[in-house]
Amino acid sequence: MTNIRKTHPLMKIVNNAFIDLPAPSNISSWWNFGSLLGVCLILQILTGLFLAMHYTSDTMTAFSSVTHICRDVNYGWIIRYMHANGASMFFICLFMHVGRGLYYGSYTFLETWNIGVILLFTVMATAFVGYVLPWGQMSFWGATVITNLLSAIPYIGTNLVEWIWGGFSVDKATLTRFFAFHFILPFIIAALAMVHLLFLHETGSNNPTGIPSDADKIPFHPYYTIKDILGALLLTLFLMLLVLFSPDLLGDPDNYTPANPLNTPPHIKPEWYFLFAYAILRSIPNKLGGVLALVSSILILILMPLLHTSKQRSMMFRPFSQCLFWILVADLLTLTWIGGQPVEYPFITIGQLASILYFLIILVLMPVTSTIENNLLKW
C-alpha cells in the first residue's frame, strides 16, 4: 500500500515541502530563521485575534480598551505583551534572515529574493499600522509624522495624505482603517510566504559554501524538523523572558499617555526596528530627499543581485567582503542608536556619516571589493 502522505493531494504538498524535501546536509543555524518567521507569524495572528475580540477601533475608547485588556480580561496582559514583543522577535528574525541572505549570496534566487523584499515591506507596513492602534501619544504622533511624509510627493502629495487620513488630520477614520489594514495584512503576508516557499523549493536551499549541493542532500524530516523545533523553543524562551520580566523594555513610555493632538511629545520616534530607516530619513535636511533615502534604504535590497560582481556566491571564502559585511552591520546598529537620539550635535553629523557609509558600502565598496577578490584568485 502506498503511503497516504505521498498520494493524498493535500498531504502530498505538505510532504514535498516539510518531510521528503531534499535539503543540503551542511546548512547552519542561520537557516533556522525562515521557520522562526513562520512561528512568529502564527503567534502574531493568534495573539492578534484574541486582542481583536476585546479591542475597539474608536478614538474615544481605543486606549481604554487596551487598558481593559490588560486589567480585566483573563490573561489579557500576557496576550497583549506577547503580541507587542512578538513583533520585536519577528523583526529580529527578519533582520537575521535578510543578513544571512546577503552574507551567503542567497539573493541569486531572484524570485525568492524579490518576494522576500516585498514581504519585508508588508511586515513593516503591518507593524506601523499596528503601532497606531493603542492610541497613545507615540501612536498618534508617529502616525501623523510618518503619513505626512507622503505629502513630499510632488503634485499629488497633499491629496494622498488626506485620502489616507480620511480627513484633514489623523482621527477616527484613520484609526478605523488602520485597524482594518492591521487585520488583513498578516493574511496577505501568510499567502506571500507560501509563494516565497514555492519559489525556494523550485531551486532548493542555498548552503554556507554557496556551492551546489545536489550531490549531498538529506531529507528535511527528521534532521531539520528537530533543528527547527529547537530553534522555535529557544525563540519562545527568549520571547517569554522578555514578556514576563521586562515587557516594556522595547516600548516607549509616551505610549502610556492617551493621544492628545494638542500636546506634541519632545522626541517623536518609532519602535526600535524602524530606527535605522528613521535615522536615514532625518539625516537629509530636505523632505522629499529624506523620503527617497528612506525608501531606497530598503529598496536597495532589490539591487543586490545586480551588484554581485564576485565569481563566488557566498562570502565564506571572501575575507575582505566579510569585513565589509560586518562594518555594514555595525553601521546599521549605529543608525539604530542615532534614530533614537534627539536631533542635535553630534548626533546629526554621526547620522549623516552613517547614512552615507550605508549606501557607499552597498553600492560601491562591496562590488569593488568583490572584483579585487576575483583578481586575487588569479595569483
Swiss-Prot record:
Binds 2 heme b groups non-covalently. Gene3D superfamilies: Cytochrome Bc1 Complex, Chain C. Pfam families: Cytochrom_B_C, Cytochrome_B. Keywords: Electron transport, Heme, Iron, Membrane, Metal-binding, Mitochondrion, Mitochondrion inner membrane, Respiratory chain, Transmembrane, Transmembrane helix, Transport, Ubiquinone. Heme b b566 binds at residues 97, 196. Belongs to the cytochrome b family. Heme 1 (or BL or b562) is low-potential and absorbs at about 562 nm, and heme 2 (or BH or b566) is high-potential and absorbs at about 566 nm. This is Cytochrome b. It comes from Alces alces cameloides.
